[in-house]
Amino acid sequence: VSEATPETLVIEFRAAEQLLDARDPRGALKLLDTVVAAHPENTAARLLRARAFFLGAQLRPAEMEFQTVLEREPDNAFAHFALGRTLQRANRKDEARRHFRLAAALDPRPEFVEAADFDPPRPPT
C-alpha cells in the first residue's frame, strides 16, 4: 500500500464524489475513509462521508458525521438539512424539525423552508 499524498487524496475525494453520484455509497466510503483518516479536520470530506452513510442507510454513522461537521461549522445549512433528513428517517421527527428549521433560517432555499414546516402566518384580526 502506497503512502497517501495530497494529490492522491484529492483524486480519492473526487472519485468518491463520482461514486456517490453513481449511487455507490460503499465505494465512496472506502475512498473517504482514507481521506478522513489523513485529514480528520476536513469538513468537506466528512460531509461527503456523511452523505455516503445516509445513502447507504447507515443512519447512526451519518448522524455522527453530520454532527461533527456542525460542531465545526454551526452555520452550515446543508449539514443541518441533511441531519434533519437523517433524523427523520430514524423516526426522530422533533429532533429533525429543529435542524430543518435551522437550515431554513440559515438559507431560505425552497426545499429547506418546505422541510421546516413552519406554521402558516395568521391572518390579521
Model-inferred region functions:
Residues 77, 81, 85-112:
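TPR/TPR-like (Sel1-like) alpha-helical repeat modules
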Residues 6-38:
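Alpha-helical segment of the N-proximal tetratricopeptide repeat
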Residues 4, 38, 72, 89, ...:
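Structural marker of alpha-solenoid helical repeat scaffolds
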Residues 22-30, 56-68, 90-102:
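Structural signature of tandem alpha-helical TPR/SEL1-like repeats
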